[in-house]
């Protein structure tokens, strides 16, 4: 087969351009990324070789070897792992076979424009191979997949295309040769390579050798599984570098959990909570990313049974001697031992989070900002640990821009307050100013501002926090009559409740119901409004307006007008004027429709009829009053 030239996927071309021209802050990470990929390739073959020994071809001693050619200006990183065939070469090195590629390119570009030129996103997005182009103006890969006879060569200068051709005599695995740029020739110095490997790859369980011109290859790393060492023999720096390896991140992990469980079921866990959000935190598969080993033999990095999905931000390894080496996907799904490991890991992680929250609330809030939206999924999904997870939750409120615990808010409840109140929406600042919370704020009642989509679901699973009911301010009745305003005075309501005034409001309500028809289930006087003329709320027990909106955005629902109630403020001057008009037989139809659209807009919706809304608004502006 002759050489074939192919074009990179569009997003890869953008990525390469950014890598080549912008990301120069810490170029030596390319070696860490390529060694990490080589280690993964060896792990995969070791696992496949358990059930298909012929794939090992009589060579089960896995290794990664570095070699340099000073005259040619090349650095080669070779492994005897799983290797790739033609299809895999094109799939893995010509495309980014993951969702969100455009988002990645944009995020990487934004990072590159920052003063630091942060390159941590490269590994996080599973494209560490492309970091080679930070130091090379040409990259060649010679590879042969285990169990196949044909070898292949992949070559590219990173400028939009790559070539693939057959090659004879290729060894199993992959050899990546970098033709180094003139300003990257320092990577031809063997002492520099030793330093980089010792710093970034000492924990790699596969031996990393340096092949000099004379003598036997020299071992550069310790090549022992870090998690098997006693904790007191591991430095913070070694933990951090191992985290960089398993998480493909550059930041310091926020938390490290390393322990050995003994007894009927034995396993070792080395887990990390990242210092920043992984890019794939909100992908649809919601899979945990912890590696499973059996007796230090890699089994899978795609084991959904190790952790619940709401802890999918955790990275690390779990190694057990009580699982069979030939464990299959089906066995993993049904293995009671794995369920026990999952329970143990989950409990330890939640306990550690609770301790960090007690010991250092400020540091815990950093974690919460990154992963709170995911952790709250567990409140809805994990009945057994629901109360523990509720205790870990932090929320902004109408009284606090800094997220606080529910225990704190309950401790600040007003005398006579019967429930813990919340409102859901897209933006905390907007929620704090929404009409539905006016009456609560006026009475000094603190309201939780819930802005994550998952909030709509977990609140349905938590009717009470301890002995305190949890209630939506935009649903059902307001229940504020027993609470005094902050200044200790109730509104001057004698006149408002006089028979004549009540009759006027009744006339207005009847007229507005007639004008709005089926757009609402009811129109009623509000106890929650103090400044705004109207607002929309959901009927008691009905789906919230915000959840209706989320479902419509996901094409899973429509406006449920039969569940909506329009509340009017009897103390507002505009409402009083309309009541006078309705009581004397005047029409309030146009005003009712205009106020309904105003309430819709405040809920983040469009008017029912934008053209009619604009016409009514123009007429009102022209008259100067209704």
UniProtKB/Swiss-Prot annotation:
User: By its UniProt entry, which CDD domains does this protein fall under?
Assistant: HATPase_Hsp90-like
Give one GO molecular function term. unfolded protein binding
Q: What Gene Ontology cellular-component terms does the record carry? A: cytoplasm
Which keywords annotate this record?
ATP-binding, Chaperone, Cytoplasm, Nucleotide-binding, Stress response
Task: Cite the residue spans of the region called A.
Answer: 1-329
Renumbered to this chain, region (B) spans 330-549
Enumerate the HAMAP family for this protein: HSP90
Entry function: Molecular chaperone. Has ATPase activity.
Identification of the protein by name: Chaperone protein HtpG
């Amino acid at each position: 087969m002759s050489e074939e030239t192919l074009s990179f996927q569009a997003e890869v071309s953008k990525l390469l351009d950014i890598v080549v021209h912008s990301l120069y802050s810490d170029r030596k990470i390319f070696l860490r990324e390529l060694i990490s990929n080589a280690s993964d390739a060896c792990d995969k073959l070791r696992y496949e070789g358990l059930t298909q020994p012929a794939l090992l071809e009589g060579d089960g001693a896995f290794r990664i070897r570095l070699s340099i050619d000073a005259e040619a200006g090349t650095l080669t990183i070779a492994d005897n792992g799983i290797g790739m065939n033609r299809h895999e070469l094109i799939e893995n090195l010509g495309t980014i076979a993951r969702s969100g590629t455009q988002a990645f390119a944009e995020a990487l570009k934004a990072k590159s424009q920052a003063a630091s030129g942060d390159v941590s996103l490269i590994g996080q997005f599973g494209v560490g191979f492309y970091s080679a182009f930070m130091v090379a103006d040409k990259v060649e890969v010679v590879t042969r997949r285990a169990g196949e006879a044909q070898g292949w060569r992949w070559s590219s200068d990173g400028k939009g295309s790559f070539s693939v051709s057959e090659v004879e005599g290729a060894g199993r695995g992959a050899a990546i040769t970098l033709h180094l740029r003139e300003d990257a020739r320092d990577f031809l110095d063997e002492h520099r390579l030793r330093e980089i490997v010792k710093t970034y790859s000492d924990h790699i369980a596969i031996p990393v050798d340096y092949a000099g011109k004379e003598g036997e290859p020299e071992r550069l790393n310790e090549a022992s599984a870090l998690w098997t060492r006693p904790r007191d023999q591991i430095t913070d720096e070694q933990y951090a570098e191992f985290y960089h390896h398993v998480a493909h991140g550059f930041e310091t992990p926020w938390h490290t959990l390393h322990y050995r469980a003994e007894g009927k079921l034995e396993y070792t866990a080395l887990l990390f909570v990242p210092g920043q959000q992984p890019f794939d935190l909100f992908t649809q598969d919601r899979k945990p990313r912890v590696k499973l080993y059996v007796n230090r033999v890699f089994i899978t990095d795609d084991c959904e049974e190790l952790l619940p999905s709401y802890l999918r931000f955790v990275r690390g390894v779990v190694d057990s001697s009580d699982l069979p080496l030939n464990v299959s996907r089906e066995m993993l799904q049904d293995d009671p031992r794995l369920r026990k490991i999952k329970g143990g890991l989950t409990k330890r992680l939640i306990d550690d989070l609770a301790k960090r929250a007690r010991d250092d609330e400020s540091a815990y809030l950093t974690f919460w900002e990154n992963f709170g939206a995911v952790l709250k999924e567990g409140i809805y999904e994990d009945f057994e640990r629901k109360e523990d997870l509720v205790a870990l939750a932090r929320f902004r409120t109408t009284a606090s821009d800094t997220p606080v615990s529910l225990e704190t808010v309950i401790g600040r409840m007003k005398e006579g307050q019967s429930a813990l109140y919340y409102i859901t929406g897209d933006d905390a600042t907007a929620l704090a100013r929404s009409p539905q919370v006016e009456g609560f704020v006026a009475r000094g009642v603190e309201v939780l501002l819930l802005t994550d989509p998952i909030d709509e679901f977990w609140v349905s699973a938590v009717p009470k926090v301890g002995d305190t009911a949890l209630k939506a301010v935009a649903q059902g009745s307001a229940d504020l009559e027993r609470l005094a305003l902050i200044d200790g005075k109730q509104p001057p309501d004698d006149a408002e409740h006089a028979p004549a005034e009540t009759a006027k409001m009744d006339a207005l309500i009847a007229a507005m119901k007639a004008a709005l028809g089926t757009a609402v289930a009811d129109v009623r006087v509000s106890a929650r409004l103090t400044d705004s003329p109207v607002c929309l709320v959901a009927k008691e027990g009905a789906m919230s307006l915000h959840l209706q909106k989320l479902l419509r955005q996901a094409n899973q629902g429509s406006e449920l007008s039969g569940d909506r109630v329009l509340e009017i403020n009897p103390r507002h001057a505009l409402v009083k004027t309309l009541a006078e008009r309705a009581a004397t037989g005047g029409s309030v139809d146009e005003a009712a429709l205009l106020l309904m659209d105003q309430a819709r807009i405040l809920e983040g919706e469009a008017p029912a009829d934008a053209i009619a809304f604009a016409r009514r608004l123009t007429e009102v502006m022209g008259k100067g009053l209704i």
